[in-house]
Amino acid sequence: MVKYSQEPDNITKSCKARGADLRVHFKNTRETAHAIRKLPLNKAKRYLEDVIAHKQAIPFTRFCRGVGRTAQAKNRHSNGQGRWPAKSAQFVLDLLKNAESNAEVKGLDVDALFISHIQVNQAAKQRRRTYRAHGRINPYMSNPCHIELILSEKEEPVKKEPETQLAAKSKKGASS
C-alpha cells in the first residue's frame, strides 16, 4: 500500500487518488493543484475543463518568472500572471475523475465532495541527450511529478442549542 503524506480526518467520509512518475511538468502541475485546492469537486472539474478550453487561466504565484500577464488570471485574485497548462490540467482532471469513481464505490455523496488535500511532488528526472555542434552532447531532462489528492465530504457543523433563560442563583450567605 502506498503512503500518503496526510491522512484524511474522517476515513469513512473521504476517498483518495494518486499518480506516480507522471510525464507532465512539475512546475505547471504545482500551480494547477494550488488553484483548485479546497474547491468543491464539481467546481474544480468545470474550472480545469475551462483551462483546457482557454476560457479561464491558472494564476502562477511561485514559478512565475517570465510568465506573461492576462486578465483571466487577475480574475483569480493574483497579480495577473497566468497561463493555460492544458496537459497539467488534463492529468489533474483525470485524477479527480478517478477519485470520484472511488467515492462512488465507497458510497459517498459525490455532490458534497471537496478537495481537502492535493499535493504535487517532484519525481526522479528522466534523462535524454541532445547533440550539439563540435561533437558535444548536452542533457535533455524532463521533470515528471507525483500527484496525490484526497476528496472529503463537507461536514455540516453541529448547531448550537438556543440558550434558555436559567433561574437566577441565590447567594449562599443570604438568609431568607
UniProtKB/Swiss-Prot annotation:
The Basic and acidic residues compositionally biased stretches are: 154-163
Keyword ATP-binding annotated: no
A molecular function annotated in GO for this UniProt entry is:
mRNA binding
Q: Which UniProt keywords apply?
A: Ribonucleoprotein, Ribosomal protein
Region: Disordered; residue ranges are 154-176
Q: Name one GO biological process term.
A: translation
- Judging by the UniProt lineage, the source's domain of life is Eukaryota
GO CC, one annotated term: cytosolic large ribosomal subunit
Q: Which NCBIfam families match?
A: PRK04223.1 (NF003260), uL22_arch_euk (TIGR01038)
Q: Per the similarity annotation, which family is this?
A: Belongs to the universal ribosomal protein uL22 family.
Q: What is this protein called?
A: Large ribosomal subunit protein uL22z
